[in-house]
Amino acid sequence: MKRTCKYLAFGAAAVLIAMMMAATVVERLQGTPVAFQWFYHSPLFIVLWAVATIAGVIYLVMEGTPKRLWTMGLHVGLVVILTGALVTHLFGTSGSIHLREGETTADYELDDETPAKLPFGIRLEAFAIDYYEGTRRPLDYRSDITFLPKGNAVRISMNNIAKYRGYRFYQADYDEDGLGSILAVSHDPWGVGITYAGYLLLLLSMIGFFFEKDTAFRKALRRVATMTAAVALFALAPAPASAQSMPEGMGMPRKEASTPDFMLTSKAKVQANELYMAIARPKVQFMLCLTLGIVLFVLGAVLISKKRKFPAWVLHGSAVIALLMWLYLTLVIGLRWYISGTGPYVGRYNVMMLMAWFSTLAILLLYRRFPLIEPLGFLLAGFTMLLASRESVSPQIMPLMPVLRSPLLSIHVVSMMMSYTLFGLVAFNGIMGLAVPSREAKESLRDVSLVVLYPAVFLLTFGTFLGAVWANISWGSYWAWDPKETWALITMLVYAFTLHGGALKPFRNPNFFHGYTIFAFVCVLVTYFGVNLLLGGMHSYM
């Protein structure tokens, strides 16, 4: 019975991963309605989630997991989240309402284009667009409305919703003449609350898990602590990316105004911009980091297999180069921040340069104690600067889109990119694990990967679900199966398999484990780059 439940749970999860991958491709080729009909809203998709949940709970109980409070809490939190999603699917409604200034109506349209009626009236008093000073770049969209017959007046804007009698209203779009507004309407009195309760339980359990005794994480950590390899990987932590869907027109102008990239309002900013434009492309820097990273990587693999340490002159010389790279990155990021007035949280160029900044900083802080951080850190810095160098020759510095002006942006983005960076370290560690001939070295590197994977998966989970909260606050849907969020979920599930070596025997084999972590990183690449470049969705602005 226990074995049957185990295979049902993990088997259903594997099929769900395959279905979600296929769904994002079908959506690109055939459109969103077809993807929802064939996959996301299909009976098979729902049944598979139910099978994975029920079989998983039975297996956990039979395995004795309830005795481990926080481990059980992680899984119960996921069950609560899925329960909330089911309630939303069965009983929640959403749609849109079109208003013209001075018009009163109770009629709106559901997402499936079915007419519906509100139990009250709503009137648009005025609609306006605020712009960044000196530009035609939208800063915010505002709808002043009144709920009738009581006459409650409210203002709806980006990240500022209206709630009335169990309904929530969000700024979604507007008419070309500026005299009309389109509001998203959501009515889900139970599903959101249940889902949020699951998010909270999951967060508390993820924190508590690191203090729980005799978990696979604690055992791997103890083994890693006894060797001179890279416990340092655990400490590496960078920043930005995103994972929630945005309705069309929400916070993104349909036509960009033909304006200067940014209005530089002082002589100091003009001079800073000239310096920034002269040094912003890190071509020499990425080539140096990649070359040094590859050399140190090969040297590290040889030394680990022979149980020897890095020569001191190699470590200190590499640290000097890391310091120069860090100073360069600090200057570029600082100039960009000063000129734009916006932190480096949005855009591929910002993301890649900030990842490189954290990578070089980690080398400086940790290389004396954990030498393996040098090859992995240089490789990450090199690859991320390579990607940054392939962005536009003159990276535009633009104000944030209205929907991105949220305090949740930096937290969401930082947690997602921290997880992606840690997954990158695990992938490089996996390559080294396959390269070294010693079985003992392979096992040790597997332990290093496990120590990194737990916080990486938890950060990805936290960032994804925080993005869901942000989406619900901003446009009324905490999960809309946008390709970006779907691939974030796929990545989460793919990496979750690596944390279940106790139940899945292949993951106890170091060669299989290292090979799997390399394959799994492809999911990260698809999530961040593939969705933007190939699959589309509303995250391509990132």
Regions found by a protein language model. Give the residues of each.
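Solvent-exposed, non-transmembrane regions of integral membrane proteins
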Residues: M1-M542
